[in-house]
């Protein structure tokens, strides 16, 4: 098994051929622990996925930003993101999730740390405050401040 007793993993990936995952799942005897979703998820169903998970892992090797991050904020779901592109700018390390090296070991270590004590719940609570940075109200306030500075 995975070593995480009573845990399941839900994978949503539209970029990697599913055969690769199916082979890894079978080779490791994880058929009862992994749910693979390799199809488009309509907007009206997204809430079910984010409500069912303890946290989101975005193990990108390269990225700029991620729409998944903003959705995770909306549902107050903690995150593990790799330190690529601008992800570390929108996921403060140790506050709403962990920013890790874009390596298998880096991601694995960050996932394990999520299960330390009350980390997940603490990150969920921090997310309530942190997500305000991305609200329309905050954006309008910052635009108005910028306008006043350049006027």
Annotate each predicted stretch with a short phrase.
Residues 48-64, 77:
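Acidic donor-binding loop of glycosyltransferase active sites
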Residues 41-52, 70, 74, 92:
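Short acidic alpha-helix that forms the nucleotide-activated donor recognition element
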Residues 78-81, 91:
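Short hydrophobic beta-strand element within catalytic cores of glycosyltransferases
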Residues 1-11:
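Single conserved hydrophobic/aromatic residue that forms the stacking wall/gate
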Residues 19-40:
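Nucleotide-activated donor-binding/catalytic signature segment of Leloir-type glycosyltransferases, i.e.
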Residues 119-133, 142-145:
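A short, well-ordered alpha-helix in the C-terminal region of glycosyltransferases
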Residues 93-104, 112-118:
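Conserved acidic donor-binding segment of nucleotide-sugar-dependent glycosyltransferases
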Residues 60-70, 88-89:
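Nucleotide-sugar-dependent
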């Amino acid at each position: 098994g995975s070593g995480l007793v009573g845990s399941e993993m839900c994978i949503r990936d539209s970029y990697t051929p599913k055969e690769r995952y199916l082979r890894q799942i079978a080779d490791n005897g994880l058929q009862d622990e992994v749910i693979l979703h390799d199809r488009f998820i309509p907007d009206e169903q997204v809430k079910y996925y984010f409500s069912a998970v303890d946290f989101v892992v975005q193990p990108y090797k390269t990225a700029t930003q991620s729409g998944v991050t903003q959705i995770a904020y909306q549902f107050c779901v903690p995150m593990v993101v790799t330190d690529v592109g601008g992800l570390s700018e929108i996921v403060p390390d140790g506050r709403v999730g962990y920013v890790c090296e874009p390596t298998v070991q880096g991601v694995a270590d960050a996932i394990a740390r999520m299960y330390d004590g009350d980390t997940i719940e603490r990150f969920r609570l921090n997310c309530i405050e942190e997500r305000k940075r991305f609200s329309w109200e905050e954006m309008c306030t910052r635009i108005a401040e910028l306008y006043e500075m350049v006027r």
